[in-house]
Regions:
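Conserved alpha-helix/loop element of class I SAM-dependent methyltransferases that forms part
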Residues: 34-53, 68
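Short glycine-dipeptide loop
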Residues: 52, 147-153
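C-terminal alpha-helical "lid/dimerization" subdomain adjacent to the S-adenosyl-L-methionine
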Residues: 6-12, 18-33, 154-212
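A short SAM/SAH-binding and catalytic strip from SAM-dependent methyltransferases
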Residues: 123-135
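A short glycine-rich, Lys/Arg-flanked "PGG" loop and its adjoining helix->strand segment in the class I
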Residues: 137-149
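A short acidic, Gly/Pro-enriched loop at the edge of an enzyme's catalytic core
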Residues: 112-123
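Class I SAM-dependent methyltransferase SAM/SAH-binding core
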Residues: 54-113
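C-terminal lobe and adjacent flexible extensions of AdoMet/dcAdoMet transferase-like proteins
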Residues: 211-220
């Protein structure tokens, strides 16, 4: 059956958003590179990326967010991690120029155990992946561990739990077993993980959320 006949939903189900795999996983990631662009651009407006920053993207998927951030980082370094080999391969292809100039690395790794020393990154972002994190509270503590003092973490999603979600959105949450907290629950998760100066950004007219957390100077 050709992709002209198959629906995007069929490709997404086959491609497995939780752990992209196979040819359909690659197709799904390339589509997500485009569909996630608006929410990513909105969320990045809450950051001031410096040219010397060291930046980590957790659950980097097809690599589009990294490619966008790389335009602002000239002498710093960017790293993407994903536990899906298909995602790693797709993100590497998306960012081949930056990788070839040693400005970026894409690694196969999980948020459960990030392969980095404490206090490594100035900024950390995750776009549309928190839904699938296996142990959200524990995983947020792992993010805080590798974030530098005074560093910033952005959690970006195009849906959060609230009244009035569409039937289709609720169906997707059920079918893909998405972890989908309310803004208040996000704040509690971040507080209990040890983040400070937590800000919840919501987009008017959309279901988008960006949770911004900081690592206080002197934190461990």
């Amino acid at each position: 059956m050709s992709d002209m006949i198959r629906t995007q939903e069929e490709i997404t189900i086959s491609g497995n958003p939780r752990h992209p795999e196979g040819v359909d996983g690659s197709k799904m990631l390339l589509r997500m590179n485009e569909s996630h662009t608006p929410v990513t651009g909105w969320a990045l407006g809450f950051w001031t990326v410096n040219e010397t920053d060291t930046v980590l993207d957790i659950g980097c998927g097809g690599g589009a967010a990294l490619k966008r951030i790389a335009t602002q980082v000239t002498t710093g370094h960017l790293i993407g991690v994903d536990y899906s080999p298909v995602s790693v391969a797709t993100a590497r292809e998306t960012n081949s120029d930056a990788i070839n100039t040693h400005k970026m690395d894409i690694l196969e790794a999980s948020v459960e155990q990030l392969p980095f020393a404490d206090d490594t990154f100035d900024k950390i972002i995750t776009v549309e992946s928190f839904y699938f994190w296996p142990s959200p509270q524990k995983n947020l503590k792992e993010v805080l561990r590798v974030l530098k003092n005074s560093g910033t973490f952005l959690l970006v999603a195009d849906v959060y739990q609230k009244e009035g979600l569409s039937d289709k959105t609720l169906e997707n949450i059920r079918n893909f077993h998405l972890f989908n907290p309310t803004p208040e629950e996000f704040r509690t998760l971040f507080e209990q993980a040890g983040f400070s100066d937590i800000q919840i950004h919501l987009k008017d007219g959309k279901d988008w959320i960006c949770v911004e957390g900081h690592k206080a100077s002197g934190s461990r």
